């Protein structure tokens, strides 16, 4: 009986979150579809999950970086980024750090970053559009980063600090 009450309570809470952010979710869905159909981005699919996608647009000549290393999901990378929402609201930036470098293991980021970074070469600069399903999903991360938020990153892959296979 207690388990039934807990499940019902959880379901009610999830429905409440979905109802509260319904317009925001629909706006994000619509905007993402517009970007997908715009022809400005390349659709990337995760090799580990065919339903996981991210959009990417390179800002550099990729022929100049094609021989540079690409990170593995277990690599530690140095990147610079600026994050905003679909409506232009700024969320975060590595440029607020002293050296403007964000160092992380690729697989310790949201799935959309994993998809994009493993396709980038050192030196590439891109805009990455991550649908909320490959971002933070239905989780509210802050008063700015609401549930169902698509993430738009301007990213430069600066270096692979550790190229680690396992």
Question: How would you label these PLM feature ranges?
Answer:
Residues 1-3:
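Sec-dependent signal peptide recognition
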Residues 13-166:
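Cross-family detector of peptidyl-prolyl cis-trans isomerase
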């Amino acid at each position: 009986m207690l388990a039934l009450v807990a499940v019902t309570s959880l379901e009610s809470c999830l429905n409440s979150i979905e109802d509260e952010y319904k317009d925001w979710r629909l706006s994000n869905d619509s905007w993402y579809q517009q970007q997908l159909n715009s022809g400005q981005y390349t659709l990337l699919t995760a090799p580990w999950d065919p339903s996981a996608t991210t959009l990417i647009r390179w800002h550099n000549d990729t022929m100049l970086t094609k021989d540079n290393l690409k990170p593995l999901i277990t690599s530690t990378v140095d990147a610079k980024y600026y994050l905003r929402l679909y409506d232009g609201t700024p969320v975060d930036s590595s440029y607020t750090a002293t050296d403007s470098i964000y160092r992380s293991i690729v697989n310790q980021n949201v799935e959309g970053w994993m998809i994009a970074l493993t396709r980038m070469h050192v030196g590439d600069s891109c805009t990455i559009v991550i649908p909320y399903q490959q971002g933070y999903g239905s989780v509210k991360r802050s008063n700015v980063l609401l549930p169902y938020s698509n993430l738009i990153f301007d990213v430069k892959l600066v270096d692979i600090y550790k190229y680690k296979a396992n």
